[in-house]
């Protein structure tokens, strides 16, 4: 067995303590995780204070959805910081780092799988869309995150990594269709089109950054280091989650009357049923 293969085997069998040591030795990676944990803690306290006077059922649902975003994030980032959801992967032949062991913070996909549906739930409630449309957006989003995780973890085939990346992007296109085509009309009918439009653009622009980072980072063509990629993801998370949720919750707290309905309708957007 060569020295290179011995090193590779050792890294693949690395313990959580070994992974934690590797994280802590990488300043960019380590700082990108802890900054997010600190911000999530502050945001949780802020959102509790902002939502204390909200009373209407629909507004409360929006508040709960926005609260879950930093709650999920702080839990998931703590998993990254501990090394629990980070591991070494040997890149397959054809990859730019073929044969090398790459540190993979795959726990980010858990963050996105549980937090991004809450963002869509909050947006759907704001637009007062119908349950079928909301279900479509959330399930497509979960599919996007799960297939993205598969793309990141596959080590048997370089081609299959990109196949799953393409499938993930296809799910993303479905989410974009709902956000850009279906929900704006619902928001217009609900009287929330102005704030919905702002949050829609913020979400779409920032979410487009994730597949770009994947492609440029060590999971894709490896033009960016693990630490730089991690900071890119953390920066996007801060804007797409905490800033988004703050803008939404601030608007809801100040305009609760505009979202005073009881919640989702079944069938045709937020339109009220016709009288007999």
Swiss-Prot record:
Protein name, entry field: Halorhodopsin
Gene Ontology MF terms: monoatomic ion channel activity; photoreceptor activity
GO cellular component, one term: plasma membrane
N6-(retinylidene)lysine, modified sites: 241
Gene3D superfamilies named among the record's database cross-references: Rhodopsin 7-helix transmembrane proteins
Record's function text: Light-driven chloride pump.
Cytoplasmic face residues: 52-57, 128-130, 181-192, 255-276
SUPFAM superfamilies: Family A G protein-coupled receptor-like (SSF81321)
Chief place where the protein resides: membrane
Extracellular side of membrane: 22-25, 82-105, 155-157, 217-225
Family: Belongs to the archaeal/bacterial/fungal opsin family.
InterPro entries (UniProt xref): Arc/bac/fun_rhodopsins, Rhodopsin_retinal_BS
Membrane topology (UniProt): Multi-pass membrane protein
Propiece residues: 1-21
TM ranges: 26-51, 58-81, 106-127, 131-154, 158-180, 193-216, 226-254
Source superkingdom: Archaea
Gene Ontology biological-process entries: phototransduction
Subcellular location(s) per record: Cell membrane
Keywords of this entry: Cell membrane, Chromophore, Ion transport, Membrane, Photoreceptor protein, Receptor, Retinal protein, Sensory transduction, Transmembrane, Transmembrane helix, Transport
């Amino acid at each position: 067995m060569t020295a290179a293969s011995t090193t590779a085997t050792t890294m693949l069998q690395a313990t959580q303590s070994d992974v934690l040591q590797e994280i802590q030795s990488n300043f960019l990676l380590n700082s990108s995780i802890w900054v997010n944990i600190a911000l999530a803690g502050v945001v949780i306290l802020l959102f509790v204070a902002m939502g204390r006077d909200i009373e209407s059922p629909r507004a409360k649902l929006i508040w709960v959805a926005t609260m879950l975003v930093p709650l999920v994030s702080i839990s998931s980032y703590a998993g990254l910081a501990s090394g629990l959801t980070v591991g070494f992967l040997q890149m397959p032949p054809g990859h730019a780092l073929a044969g090398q062991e790459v540190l993979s913070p795959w726990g980010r996909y858990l963050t996105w799988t549980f937090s991004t549906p809450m963002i869509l739930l909050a947006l759907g409630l704001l637009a007062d869309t119908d349950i079928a449309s909301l279900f479509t957006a959330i399930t497509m989003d979960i599919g996007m995150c799960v297939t993205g995780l598969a793309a990141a973890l596959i080590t048997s085939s370089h081609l299959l990594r990109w196949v799953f990346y393409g499938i993930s992007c296809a799910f993303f296109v479905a989410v974009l269709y709902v956000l850009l085509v279906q929900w704006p009309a619902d928001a217009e009918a609900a009287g929330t089109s102005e704030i919905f439009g702002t949050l829609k653009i913020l979400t779409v622009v920032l979410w487009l950054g994730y597949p770009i980072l994947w492609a440029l980072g060590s999971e894709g063509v490896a033009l960016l280091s693990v630490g730089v990629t991690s900071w890119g993801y953390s920066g996007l998370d801060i804007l797409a989650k905490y800033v988004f949720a703050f803008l939404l919750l601030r608007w809801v707290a100040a305009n609760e009357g505009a979202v005073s309905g009881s919640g989702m309708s079944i069938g045709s957007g937020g339109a009220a049923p016709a009288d007999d």
